[in-house]
Amino acid sequence: SHEGLFLSFQYPVEIPGVSMTNFMKAAINAKRAYEGLEPMKAAEFMALMREKRQLVGMDSTLSRRSVNEGFSGGEKKRNEIFQMAMLEPKLSILDETDSGLDVDAMRIVAEGVNKMHNETTSAIVITHYERLLEMIKPDVIHVLYKGRIVKTAGP
């Protein structure tokens, strides 16, 4: 995360006893320390959390729970997109982000990814399903088969 890389897992790990709020505060302040910045003030951090929760349609109660503990599949994926939004990485690798999501949850995740995409950020989205690509606006699509790129589409 220090260098701007974010990795989302197909099966996000649960971290019992560590609240999302504490987890994100530690991650953001570690990144800020690496960049030579002061720790984020509590009010600024809470405002950022509210903004990013709204971005991905995340219920405020999830941020008080332990990281991914007892979360549904959709909540875990939404939580990962929330983490990505909070950390604002240069490159995000999203592994099977659509796995186990219903259409509504997938739409919210796709909207979050689309809102974070700009000239200074990139995302590699790994998926086996076209449905996510219908919602995310990719610049380029590479189709891999048996470890090789067999087709490329895009500008």
Regions found by a protein language model. Give the residues of each.
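Walker B catalytic motif
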Residues: E96-T97, D104
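Walker B motif beta-strand of ABC-family P-loop ATPases
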Residues: K90-E96
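H-loop (His-switch) and adjacent beta-strand-loop-beta switch element
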Residues: I136-A153
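Conserved H-loop
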Residues: T120-I136
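ABC-family P-loop ATPase nucleotide-binding domains
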Residues: E3, Q10-K90
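ABC ATPase NBD coupling module
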Residues: S1-F6, M116
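Helical segment within the ABC ATPase nucleotide-binding domain
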Residues: M106-E119
